[in-house]
């Protein structure tokens, strides 16, 4: 669940076809100062209002999985390298 308040911004660094996942899916690399830990891999992150799964953490960027259905139904079908993006971590629960 997300609260709708954008605390972080990022820039799309790369968009690649995913060979590891389902055909037609993409991996989106976003550069940002947002902080993630290894234990956050697999968590949901709101990226421009779309819930995406964090799949890898790099030094200054993060990789997210986009399914074929997500691409079809969201603004990510028009995403471009260099585009700014709003980021929001999910709320803590428990």
Set out the residue ranges of the language-model regions.
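Conserved loop->alpha-helix
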Residues: 1-94
């Amino acid at each position: 669940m997300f609260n709708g308040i954008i605390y972080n911004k990022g820039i799309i660094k790369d968009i690649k076809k995913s060979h590891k996942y389902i055909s037609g899916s993409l991996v989106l690399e976003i550069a940002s100062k947002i902080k993630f830990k290894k234990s956050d891999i697999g968590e949901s992150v709101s990226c421009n209002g779309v819930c995406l799964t964090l799949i890898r953490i790099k030094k200054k960027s993060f990789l997210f999985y986009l399914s074929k259905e997500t691409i079809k139904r969201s603004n990510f079908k028009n995403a471009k390298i260099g585009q700014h993006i709003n980021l929001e971590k999910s709320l803590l629960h428990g």
